[in-house]
Every structure is written in C-alpha cells, then in structure tokens.
Amino acid sequence: MDQSSNLTGKMLIAMPGMRDPRFEQSVILICAHSEDGAMGLVVNRPLPEIGFSDLLAQLGIQAGANALDIPVRFGGPVEPGRGFVLHRAPREIELDENRMRITDDLAMSTTRDILEDFARGLGPQPAMLALGYAGWGPGQLDSEIRENGWLTSDRGDEIIFGAEDAGKWRAALKSLGIDPLMLSPDAGHA
C-alpha cells in the first residue's frame, strides 16, 4: 500500500444500503491502516445502557467529586469488552507504550491509568471511550470502499467529539457537500 492510500486519521462514512446492520449510518475514525489491515472506532453509536460512572464502578475505580464524565460508545464488534479512549494528545506530549498516536494531535489509550485520571477530574479533553473496535483484514477495507460500502473524508473533531450522536452521520456527509437523500446505494463502474 502506498502512503497516499493510507487512511489512518481519516473518517469512514457508511453509504446508504450498508449491508452490515452493525455499521448502518456509522461514522468511523480509522486509527491504523496498513497492508496488514485496518482498525477503527465507531464514533456515533452511544451505549445508553452504560454510563462512564457505571464503568468506573465496575472497574473498582473511585470517582472523585471532580470526575469527568466522558461519553461511552460502541466502538465496533471486535473485542467489545475492551475499552479504547480516543483523546487529544498534542505533538509535544510523549506517549507511553500503551498509547498510540493516530495523528499529530490525536491518540488512543488502552490503559487503566487514563480512566483513573478522568475519575480524579484530570485527563485529556476532548475524549470519548469506545468499547470494542472495527477491524478489517489485509485488503478488506480497500475492497469495501471500492464496492461502494464507505465514503472517506478528513477527520472532523466536531463530528468525532460533538455531542449529538444521532446527527453525526448526516453531518459527516454534509461536510463532503453530500445530501444523504441524493445518495444511491448502488455503485457504477466503467
């Protein structure tokens, strides 16, 4: 794969007619993309049945009076019991081995210590916690894009970290100048 086709740090926007109901009207941030496959987090599927404070309690983390309440979302169907914190991380901040830099100013963390920081009212902002992730094998994502399953766009932090999950899919399409009502689920290839 050449560097120009690398989608790390980009967003995927599900096309109408997405065959997999787990990804219907999904917006996904691609966290890693290489010849070995791809990994991303769905950013617009809230998990209303579990709040951040509930999750802290389940993990035995005591929330302080100044605890931050970050959104908890369905990140994807792979490893749904594993948490991934997507957060700002300015370039000048050194990341440890359990944190992965996605772009110059965005990282993903999988450590308990970041959850403890949020429980104390610390931690990077904006942030979101995703349970599970979306994964693709070698060439699989590229094939799904060619088959008209996904649109790609530059990252939009207002879409990723914005408050209204229900409108994120439409907002992502509109950021590309696309009216969702004008999209066809069928692709044409010459």
Curated annotation (Swiss-Prot):
Domain of life: Bacteria
InterPro entries named among the record's database cross-references: AlgH-like
SUPFAM superfamilies recorded: VC0467-like
Single GO cellular component term: cytosol
Pfam families: DUF179 (PF02622)
Family recorded in the similarity comment: Belongs to the UPF0301 (AlgH) family.
Annotated HAMAP family: UPF0301
Protein name: UPF0301 protein Pden_0436
Annotated source species: Paracoccus denitrificans (strain Pd 1222)
Phylogenetic placement of the source organism: Bacteria, Pseudomonadati, Pseudomonadota, Alphaproteobacteria, Rhodobacterales
